[in-house]
Amino acid sequence: QLVTHIAEDYEEGAILVFLPGMGEIKALHDRLRASLYESEHRAPSSVRTEDDDDDDKKKNSPPRYLLVPLHSTLTAEEQKRAFSKPAPGVRKVVMSTNIAETSITIDDCVYVIDAGKVRETRFNAKTRTSSLETAWVSRASAKQRRGRAGRVKPGYCFHLYSSKTEAEVLEDFAIPEISRAPLDALVLQIYSLGFTDPRAFLSKCIEPPSKMAI
């Protein structure tokens, strides 16, 4: 509903939606296609993909949409679609993981919708198991996401959580990967470089992992 509201009631500009992972991206992509097809009895041509033609533009017709998923498993060529310029009257909607926080910049992004969640690997040193968990973003990440809006003109950011949640639930910064991911490969790499004590080596990190994790 928010994507549709922005697309129909706000000035032109791409919409960037931050989601935790590929499952949520696909779900939103499918729901947007379905709702846009049905909305105001629009024809399927009102939702377009990268391969659709631009020849069917009509004056006073409902706005059309370019729906673009964006995540790290896409090829470089597929990721380029997020930077494509849509035709006049076409609203680009990029549905992305946190890859769009800092790694890339979508110049024509004017609107950001932030779900406030991220999916990341967490390691339990006691059980020696890893799991992929969905967690709240940090305030620093929320600020980064907010900064993606309005790179070339004033923009808007819609956070899908309350200011109370931001103040009381979100941490200032994300947990460093070295403190939440399994260290097996890293320890082996330290040995392969000729170091004999990975505990001493890792203790010199800016934010060293726990001794139990090592």
Regions found by a protein language model. Name each.
Residues 1-214:
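P-loop NTPase motor module signature
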